[in-house]
C-alpha cells in the first residue's frame, strides 16, 4: 500500500504561509520552516500592538492637551481637575482635537476649568 502524505493539503498550507511571508528578508520568505516562525511572530506582534495602539494614542492625546494647556497658562492636571469640577465630560481624544483645530474653543474650556477651580477652592475654604 502506498504511503499517504495528504500532499495537496500540505502544499496548500505551506504555500499559504510562504504567501504571508512575502517580503520578509532572506530565508524567512523562501523556506517554509523559517517562514512559519516569522509569520507566527508577526501575527503575535500585530495582536499585541493592536492593543498597545490604544495606550499610544491616549498618550499622544495627553501630550497634545498638555501642550495646549501650557500655552494657556495652566497645567494639564489642574485643567483636568477643573473640567471635572465644572462637570464637563469630554474625553482626551476630543480635547486633543479641540486643542489642535480650535484654539479659541479650547481656551474657553480652559477658562471654565479655571473658574470651576476657583469656586472649588472658595467652597473648600468655607468648609
Curated annotation (Swiss-Prot):
Keywords: Ribonucleoprotein, Ribosomal protein, RNA-binding, rRNA-binding. GO terms for cellular component: ribonucleoprotein complex; ribosome. One of its GO terms (biological process) is ribosomal large subunit assembly. Pfam families: Ribosomal_L20 (PF00453). It comes from the Bacteria. The keyword rRNA-binding applies. GO terms for molecular function: rRNA binding; structural constituent of ribosome. HAMAP family: Ribosomal_bL20. Binds directly to 23S ribosomal RNA and is necessary for the in vitro assembly process of the 50S ribosomal subunit. It is not involved in the protein synthesizing functions of that subunit. Belongs to the bacterial ribosomal protein bL20 family. This is Large ribosomal subunit protein bL20. It comes from Opitutus terrae (strain DSM 11246 / JCM 15787 / PB90-1).
